[in-house]
From Swiss-Prot:
<keyword id="KW-0967">Endosome</keyword>
<dbReference type="InterPro" id="IPR043971">
    <property type="entry name" value="FUZ/MON1/HPS1_longin_2"/>
</dbReference>
<dbReference type="GO" id="GO:0005085">
    <property type="term" value="F:guanyl-nucleotide exchange factor activity"/>
</dbReference>
<feature type="region of interest" description="Disordered">
    <location>
        <begin position="1"/>
        <end position="173"/>
    </location>
</feature>
<dbReference type="Pfam" id="PF19036">
    <property type="entry name" value="Fuz_longin_1"/>
</dbReference>
<keyword id="KW-0344">Guanine-nucleotide releasing factor</keyword>
<dbReference type="GO" id="GO:0006886">
    <property type="term" value="P:intracellular protein transport"/>
</dbReference>
<dbReference type="GO" id="GO:0045324">
    <property type="term" value="P:late endosome to vacuole transport"/>
</dbReference>
<dbReference type="GO" id="GO:0007033">
    <property type="term" value="P:vacuole organization"/>
</dbReference>
<dbReference type="InterPro" id="IPR043970">
    <property type="entry name" value="FUZ/MON1/HPS1_longin_3"/>
</dbReference>
<dbReference type="GO" id="GO:0006623">
    <property type="term" value="P:protein targeting to vacuole"/>
</dbReference>
<dbReference type="Pfam" id="PF19037">
    <property type="entry name" value="Fuz_longin_2"/>
</dbReference>
<feature type="region of interest" description="Disordered">
    <location>
        <begin position="463"/>
        <end position="486"/>
    </location>
</feature>
<feature type="compositionally biased region" description="Polar residues">
    <location>
        <begin position="21"/>
        <end position="55"/>
    </location>
</feature>
<feature type="compositionally biased region" description="Low complexity">
    <location>
        <begin position="1"/>
        <end position="14"/>
    </location>
</feature>
<dbReference type="InterPro" id="IPR004353">
    <property type="entry name" value="Mon1"/>
</dbReference>
<dbReference type="GO" id="GO:0005768">
    <property type="term" value="C:endosome"/>
</dbReference>
Length: 607
């Protein structure tokens, strides 16, 4: 593994990699879009600094269900300037919060007794041998989940079995203690509300222990955020009378784990609204279980999405690739529906947006869209018949109910119509009938099905600029060896990329291609992206514009401009100069197809 100094100086970010046309005024961004894309020429390579960081090792990214390892441009897209070589490999330091009296187990110490509600998640198999994919070598001897082969057209959505698993486990079970990642929701009286693994009723004692820790710290006039115990992080989130806790040894950052708890809380609010607080004010021992009956599958589906859905940390949504004219026609139909008194109308295919429209001056946050689509996709009742259900959008208005009309046209495609009126079922049904007639007549539903089957962008589709390659690699052209621009993955070792449009709050993620084929490899890469994203957005340490990281698993490159963010993964032996050039090609490719992969003019989602 290559090692070198990974320090980043502010002067480097301000000079060498500064935007050619810096401007903090959003209106000027659109004026400089065209000029920024006129030239894709890069400066000559400067000194290379390979930021080698073991924190991106996939060794701790085995399946959460397995035994824990002990080692453990306005209206469009712009390039915002060219990425130049000489990227400093900055260290993305995690925020470490002080924990009072952290609990650690000494070497050789016996695990606590089953009655002590102890958590023994670090015992088990050790990490696999170092290789290109060390994350794929973890042990699966003791605990292994059923793995259902997913649809090849939707590689990002790993196989998920509806409902909670391992309901027979409790805190006395050895298997339960060895889970790598737990989520708990409980009330301020210690009553369990949700647990990722096991039966909530059997975990009442463990929930009471968590509640006691939180209350003890609060009684001292403080608030507990994070406790570190060995390889474990215990992350707490207090939302009034609701306590959320994550216990993890997956090496994810504190910020990301806390963000996951925020989403879990938002999912609960989507079902119940924040008015649930008043119930606890009247009765501190209020039992929420009856109100959340049958929603275990919703929470479990959301937890599962943390390992495959970039929307959970990018806070953006993704669209199904469609011809521009067809998407615009669909948007026109949905806008006509909104004109009849509907707040939001959305046509979705799985977790991807086909098109949407909203009432004037109404805005919808991507997190609300994520939670809403998860609620619909994980609830079997929505698939069997048209439904009219009260829901709450926590980022839109956490105090009020909206009413959602949901109808599935087929197994993947569905429409959501949101209204403030509780008596609008028949009106929304009439809107849906008219909408469906137009979609069938124009053959839109067939095109949607064909698009989801074909998948999204692929790294193999990224074009290679032969002129640029010839100007920098003349010696390679003269050599009799194989063409290094062609091989596994995309050009010059490109394995995967994610592109987020900041103005549109949308992202596009390439389909996984060899060698990133297994669920565990994909999961490991996403966690590397999460850490890279967190390190680029740490308050007080930026602003960072570029990062270049190399370890035994990947070469990771991140590029942030006022208009977009790009995250790319390359072969660990990829050449840095060529990786930077390929990133420019990716941005150009996204620009070329932006009308097909992004929803343009999505004013309801601009805030």
């Amino acid at each position: 593994m290559a090692t070198s100094d990974s320090r980043s100086s502010p002067s480097s970010s301000d000079t060498e990699f500064a935007d050619p046309n810096p401007s903090s005024d959003p209106e000027t961004n659109s004026e400089r879009v065209q000029s920024q894309l006129e030239s894709m020429n890069l400066s000559q390579p400067s000194e290379v600094s390979d930021g080698s960081h073991t924190e991106f090792s996939g060794g701790g990214d085995d399946n959460d269900d397995e035994v824990a390892s002990a080692n453990g441009n306005e209206g469009g897209v712009s390039n915002g300037g060219l990425l130049r070589e000489g990227v400093a490999g900055t260290s993305g330091g995690e925020v470490l919060l002080r924990a009072e009296n952290p609990v650690e187990m000494e070497a050789g110490e016996e695990p606590p007794s089953p009655t002590s509600s102890g958590y023994d998640g670090e015992r088990g198999s050790s990490g696999g041998a170092t290789s290109t994919y060390k994350a794929d070598d973890g042990s699966e001897d003791e605990i292994r989940e059923a793995n259902v082969d997913g649809d090849t057209a939707s590689q990002h959505e790993a196989a998920w079995l509806p409902g909670k698993r391992h309901v027979d486990e409790d805190d006395a079970s050895t298997s339960w203690r060895k889970r790598k990642k737990h989520f708990f929701i409980l009330s301020n009286s210690g009553k369990p509300i949700y647990s990722r693994y096991g039966d909530e009723h059997k975990l009442a004692g463990f929930s009471a222990t968590l509640q006691a820790i939180i209350s003890f710290v609060e009684n001292g006039g403080d608030r507990v955020n994070l406790v570190k115990a060995g390889n474990h992080q215990v992350v707490f989130l207090v939302k009034g009378p609701i306590y959320l806790v994550c216990i993890s040894c997956t090496d994810e950052t504190y910020e990301y784990l806390r963000g996951q708890l925020d989403l879990l809380y938002g999912q609960m609010i989507l079902i119940l609204t924040k008015s649930i607080d008043r119930c606890f004010e009247k009765n501190a021992k209020f039992d929420m279980t009856p109100l959340l009956g049958g929603t275990d599958a919703v929470f479990s589906s959301l937890v599962h999405s943390f390992s495959w859905n970039p929307a959970t940390f990018l806070h953006a949504y993704t669209c199904l690739p469609l011809p521009y004219a067809l998407r615009q026609a669909t948007g026109t139909i949905l806008q006509e529906v909104c004109a009849s008194g509907v707040l939001f109308s959305l046509l979705m295919c799985r977790h991807k947006v086909v098109s949407l429209a909203g009432a004037q001056k109404a805005s919808l946050h991507p997190d609300d869209l994520l939670l809403l689509s998860n609620f619909v996709m994980s609830s079997e009742s929505f698939r069997t018949s048209e439904s009219f259900s009260p829901i709450c959008l926590p980022r839109y208005n956490a105090q009020a109910f909206l009413h959602a009309y949901v109808h599935f046209f087929d197994d993947d495609t569905y429409v959501i119509l949101l209204t403030t009126r509780s008596d609008a079922f028949h009106h929304l049904k009439d809107c849906r009938v008219r909408l469906e007639a137009v979609l069938l007549k124009s053959n839109i539903l067939s095109v949607v099905q064909r698009s989801i089957a074909e998948g999204g962008m692929r790294v193999e589709d990224v074009p290679i600029d032969r002129r640029r390659r010839s100007s920098t690699t003349n010696q390679e052209q003269d050599s009799p060896g194989p063409d290094i621009s062609v091989g596994t993955g995309g050009p010059f070792g490109l394995w995967h990329f994610m592109y987020r449009s900041i103005y549109l709050d949308q992202y596009i993620s390439s389909e996984f291609s060899p060698p990133v084929t297994s669920h565990r490899q994909q999961k490991s890469l996403y966690r590397a992206y999460q850490k890279l994203y967190a390190s680029m957005h740490v308050k007080g340490l930026g602003p960072h514009k570029t990062q270049y990281r190399r370890d035994e698993n990947y070469t990771l490159l991140c590029w942030v401009t006022p208009d977009f963010e790009l995250y790319a993964a390359f072969d660990p032996l990829a050449d840095k100069a060529m990786a930077i050039k390929i990133c420019n090609q990716v941005c150009q490719r996204v620009k070329d197809v932006e009308n097909e992969v992004f929803l343009q003019g999505a004013s309801p989602f601009s805030w």
